[in-house]
């Protein structure tokens, strides 16, 4: 079994919830290796294979009316809701902040504050977005979300090569150690004042002196609480700290119409438009490329839940190829690209 992370490379709740629920109804999805498009995995989706869904979104509104389907089927899930202080120069595809705050509150009222994580992420600096600007907006958002979440996750902008040109155009500057200390020394205590704990995501810096904990991309303690069982944890150095799982869920580059300037998963607005236009929620594939033969491997899923009676809480999740004896190879002519 597995934890499905949906998704850090696109916003499924905002744009692809119809597609998601159809995949759930069909009981499987395909995952294409982005580095090797000929490698495709078939992931089974049912109560026997899925431990939990983790949704990453900036606007869950389009999905909210259908969450009862997940409740009825008995799937544990929670949301990571990114709500930042930036304008249309940085986040051109988002609704107004007041509308997003309202959506956040509605989602929290439905699920409970422990199942809606607020992400103030990434923190970036420019002539328009100064430290003082962040002080003002972080305080305002803390006040607006007080009682609707217990956790705020922050991270500082990583200047990936593919986003540098975009960030240079809005005059984003490098974050210094002094900047981090100044921001952290305000954010930690301010969030506490509103009943929240601040955690970092994939940050090497130790900010514990400012009441900020080192966090994880996916919260094992929260999931353990949802499942009512301890999890088996393992360290993953790929994100500079502790992670819960290797993300092998719904993911594809150039598919998010939010078009946030800092997003590493979008590097061609034209491709985003093309893929959005070609998208058909009725197809298991995400978008349609030219016809070609694909080699599909059915993946074995290993649960992150500790066996009953196992007192350990060392947490891991692996997606590994099945042994030759148990591996199923399927060939298909597809009229759609797989995630």
Where are these regions (language model features)?
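Active-site beta-loop-alpha junctions enriched in small/polar residues
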Residues: 9-11, 58, 82-86, 121-123, ...
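Conserved Radical SAM active-site core
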Residues: 1-90, 97, 102-113, 269-326, ...
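Surface-exposed cleft-lining segments at the edges of enzyme active sites
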Residues: 86-94, 122-132, 167-175
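Conserved C-terminal portion of the radical SAM core fold
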Residues: 99-166, 185-202
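Catalytic cores of enzyme domains
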Residues: 149-253
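Local cysteine-cluster metal-coordination motifs and their immediate loop/turn environment
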Residues: 248-268
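Cationic, low-complexity basic patches in intrinsically disordered or flexible, solvent-exposed regions
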Residues: 329
């Amino acid at each position: 079994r597995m934890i499905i992370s949906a998704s850090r490379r696109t916003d499924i709740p905002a744009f692809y919830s119809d597609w998601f629920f159809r995949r759930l109804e069909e009981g499987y999805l395909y995952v294409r290796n982005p580095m090797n498009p000929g490698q495709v995995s078939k992931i089974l989706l049912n109560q026997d294979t899925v431990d939990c869904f983790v949704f990453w979104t900036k606007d869950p509104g389009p999905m909210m009316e259908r969450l009862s389907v997940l409740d009825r089927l008995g799937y544990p899930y929670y949301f990571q809701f990114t709500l930042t202080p930036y304008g249309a120069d940085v986040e051109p595809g988002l609704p107004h902040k007041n509308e997003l705050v309202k959506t956040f509150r509605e989602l929290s009222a439905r699920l409970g504050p422990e199942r809606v994580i607020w992400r103030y992420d990434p923190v970036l600096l420019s002539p328009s977005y100064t430290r003082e600007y962040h002080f003002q907006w972080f305080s305002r958002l803390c006040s607006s979300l007080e009682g609707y979440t217990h956790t705020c996750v922050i991270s500082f902008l990583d200047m990936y090569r593919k986003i540098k040109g975009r960030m240079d155009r809005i005059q984003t500057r490098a974050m210094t150690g002094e900047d981090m200390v100044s921001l952290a020394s305000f954010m930690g205590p301010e969030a506490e004042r509103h009943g929240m704990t601040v955690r970092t995501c994939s940050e090497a810096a130790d900010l514990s002196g400012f009441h900020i904990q080192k966090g994880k991309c996916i919260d094992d303690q929260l999931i353990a609480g949802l499942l009512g069982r301890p999890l088996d944890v393992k360290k993953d150095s790929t994100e500079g700290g502790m992670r819960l799982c290797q993300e092998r869920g719904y993911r594809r580059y150039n598919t998010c119409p939010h078009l946030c300037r800092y997003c590493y998963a979008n590097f061609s607005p034209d491709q985003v438009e093309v893929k959005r236009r070609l998208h058909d929620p009725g197809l298991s594939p995400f978008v349609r490329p030219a016809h070609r033969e694909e080699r599909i491997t059915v993946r074995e899923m290993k649960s992150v839940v500790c066996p009953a009676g196992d007192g350990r809480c060392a947490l891991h999740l692996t997606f590994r190829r099945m042994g030759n004896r148990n591996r199923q190879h399927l060939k298909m002519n597809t009229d759609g690209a797989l995630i």
